[in-house]
Amino acid sequence: MTAKSEFKVSMEDRKQTYVIIPAYNEETRVRPVIEAIADMGFKIILVNDGSSDGTLDVLKDVQMKYPENIFIYSHIINRGVGLAMQTGFEAVLKYNPKYIVNIDADGQHSVDDLERVLEPLIAGRAEAVIGVRSLKDMPKSKNFGNSVMNILTHIFYGVNVSDSQTGFRALTRSALDKISINAQGYLISSEFIREINDNNIPFEEVTIETIYTPETQAKGTNYKVGIKILFTMIRHKLFD
C-alpha cells in the first residue's frame, strides 16, 4: 500500500483530471468540497441524483464561480449511487479526460488526498487506485461491516483488497474504457474491484484520510444494504 508522499500534480495534469461527485440531498455539505477541488484546478462532474432539498441550487451557484471547471448532470428522481456513477462515467467521456477520480459529496474525504491517489497513475505504476480508509479510526459498526465485505469480495470476485467499500477511487481513461459498471446502489464499490480484476487492470491501494461525522456515519453500506449486496454477488457468481 502506498504511504503518504509530497507528490504534486502538475497544472497540465489537473486540467485533464475529472472528479466525479454523485450528490443526493447534500445541500449543507457539498459546497466546501467542490469549491476546494475547483480551487485546486481540477475539473468536476457533479451528478445531482434527484435531490429533494436545495442541492441542485447549491451546485448551480458554485458552478457560476467556476464555469470552466464544473459540469452538472441531474437525475429527475433518486436512482442510487451506482446509477449516479454510471451517469458520471458516461458524461466524463465527452471531455476526453486523462484521469478520473470519484469521491463522496459529504466531506468525509479529504480533498488533499486527490494528489496522492493520482500519483500511481501519473507515475505509470497503476491504471486504477483504491483509496483505503484506516480501520482503527473507523466506527466499530462500519469496521465490522467493511471487514465482512472485504471477505465477500475475495470469495466471490477473487480479489484481496483492504477496503472494498471505499468511495474514493481513481483510474486512467484507458482503464475506464475497459470496465463496465452496471451496479445499482452501493454494489458499485465491489463491482469496480471485480471489473479491474477481470480486465487485468493493474491497481494500487493508497491510504486516505476519512472525516467521520454523525451524518457520514449514518450513510454508506449498512446491514440491510450488505445483505442485498451479498445476494447480488451470489447471483453474479452463479449466472454471469
Placement of each model-derived feature along the sequence:
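Hydrophobic helical membrane-anchoring modules
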Residues: M1-Q16, F156-G158, N182-D240
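Short, well-formed alpha-helical segments that are part of the catalytic scaffolds
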Residues: K4-K8, Y24-D39
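Hydrophobic targeting segments
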Residues: K15-I21, V30, A36-I37, K43-V47
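Short beta-strand/loop segment that forms part of the nucleotide-sugar
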Residues: I21, F42-S51, Y73-H75, I103-A105
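Acidic helix N-cap motif at the loop->helix transition within catalytic regions
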Residues: T28-P32, D53-V62
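Conserved donor nucleotide-binding strand/loop of the catalytic core
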Residues: I45, L56-Y95
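Acceptor/aglycone-binding surface of glycosyltransferases and processive sugar-polymer synthases
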Residues: H75-K94, V111-Y186, Y212-L230, I234
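Short beta-strand-to-loop acidic/aromatic patch adjacent to the donor-nucleotide binding site
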Residues: P97-Q108
